[in-house]
Amino acid sequence: IAALIGIIVCGVLYTFVTNIAIDKRVVSTYFGNIAFAYEDYGLPYCFSASLFNTGISEPNGYTKKAMAKIDKDGELNQTATSRSSDELPNIIVVQLESYFDVANAEFFTTSEDACPNLHNLYQNYSNGYFKVPSVGAGTANTEFEVLTGMNLRYFGPGEYPYKTYSKKHPTESAATALASLGYGTHALHDNTGNFYSRANVFNNMGFDTFTSKEFMNVLQTTENGWAKDEILTHHIMEAMDTTKQEDFVFTVSVQGHGNYPETQVIENPKIKVEGIEDEALKNKWEYYVNQVYEMDQFVGDLIKAVEERNEPSVVVFYGDHLPTMGLKAEDLKSRYLYNTNYVIWDNIGLQKHDKNIPAYQLMSEVLNRLDIHSGTVFNYHQQRKGTKNYLSDLELLQYDILYGKQYVYNGKAPITEGHMVMGIRNVSLSSIVPQLNSGYSLYGE
């Protein structure tokens, strides 16, 4: 009994001290990088915070009346555009793994431009810094913000909503918003389909198809085993060829993924890094920069392929987070570890308008420029961004949609179940051959 009382007392004291620390901002309730958080705040706080504090807590003032005021009598659920069906463009969004413009690094130089295609796009199309919710990791959280328009700061510390919510529950997204206008919706990823539970998540987000690595004939890989992004261009075009209407294609690349080797593994690197004295660190950055160069070649190839289709199109590129390299704010021109880069290419004459934007506002920004108003959260951003109580009302809206009573849906949720299929081709199994030691090989077409 004494031991139990001691545990209870310790728990109460821990909770009391923790709440004071949070109130005084000694510790944070938001983890942009879970590994860094463990270093900064220690095991007990980080473990308990990430284990027990998930989802969005009910905000003060959450009532049906408050949500009606935010919704403005159903305005957030409307779908509208001035464009005819022939004028609606294809929308391709490409998430570049661990990408940022290496010209923004201040502690090394490169023997030649590592991303000439992207630099050309920056000069001619809308671009800026892209504020992401994590640093050095957390790809799926940037995806979540982009696809849903929701701000990760209202979730638990270090939480991945892909794992805690969207893999189990239907979730309104850019796919459902554009499907309501007749778009075909496709997701692609040159890594395995179950990574971050994407197969379940994309199904619950309303995508029509998901083509993952298992449905690609990956022949080219990096020195540390990740698929090279050059394979994505063909599969993006193939996905668009499966429909007669306009398409929304959300593409997640993987080539820039860590770990980055401390030994020189590229025999004759196209790009050499200068200015770093530590040999191991130089090798890591030289490897990374050469992956960025090849990712940039993929960007150029994709733009060329889209141009050759001669269809109205918009292509968005952005980096999901900085690479895991121990970067510090003073290493970067932006002086901010949560900035990558984005650019919006188009062939429909959109005006160049440079600005810095957070990940959760990206799709609402793109859709607004296209005069497309669809999706509850995207409509909210378009109507309320920059107004009084914008962020506090966004928290209420996110809670209502995910964990509340869904007042804003008025009984008509945009998605109640998924319908996605894996891949875009019919797959048949012709034989199963047992291996000598264990397992089986599956053959088919």
Where are the regions a protein language model picked out?
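Solvent-exposed soluble domains appended to multi-pass membrane proteins
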Residues: 76-87, 95-96, 101-445
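N-terminal secretory/membrane-targeting segments
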Residues: 1-89, 110-129, 164-168, 172, ...
